[in-house]
Amino acid sequence: QAPKLVLFSGSVESACGMAGSAVGPFYCPADQKVYLDLVFFDELHNRFGASGDFARAYVIAHEIGHHVQMQLGILQQVSQIQSRVGTPEKNKLSVMLELQADCLAGMWAHQAHKRRDILESGDLEEGLNAASAVGDDRIQKSSRGYVVPDGFTHGSSAQRVRWFRRGFEEGTLQACNTFEADRL
């Protein structure tokens, strides 16, 4: 079942609550919709230096990756575990979910290119650059001036690039199992 996409600027009401531009794009499991903040795409280019149509495609595919996790029951399982553990473990599980969504975005790019030959020269680099731009370390460094790895909820730039690339190169769901990986 495909998710519905909701485009917004500024703020939006979802089944998960009210969200402003500071949240950026997100997936709401309660209504199974992907919410895409159009202001974020300008920020991706202007603040993080990640531009191009494939940078935007990566972000959308990442959020749809969360919908895939919902369809597979992964989001629900992780949410149950997170309700029973402390913040450090919650954050670690969140990073695993986010990196898996990055991998699923790479898997989508692999399959789309294989079936439709859609990638142009430079597209993969745009996606990798976007993955790097939204790493917790880069965001923390730019907003706080320092990095606190224990506070990561999405993964470092290097991790996000690695998992997006892995999904793209392998192109299989099995390759995206961050929960059993030796190295995130």
Spans of model-derived segments:
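Short pre-active-site segment immediately N-terminal to the catalytic Zn-binding motif
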Residues: 40-59, 89-95
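Active-site recognition of the HExxH zinc-binding catalytic motif
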Residues: 36, 55-71, 102, 106
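Acidic helix-start/capping segments at beta-turn-to-alpha-helix junctions
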Residues: 1-17, 83-85, 122-128
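Pan-zinc metallopeptidase signature
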Residues: 132-184
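Short helix/loop segments within enzyme catalytic domains
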Residues: 1, 89-92, 96-139
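Catalytic zinc-binding patch centered on the HExxH motif and its immediate surroundings
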Residues: 10-37
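A mature extracytoplasmic/lumenal domain signature
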Residues: 9, 38-40, 72-73
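Post-HEXXH active-site segment of zinc metalloproteases
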Residues: 70-98
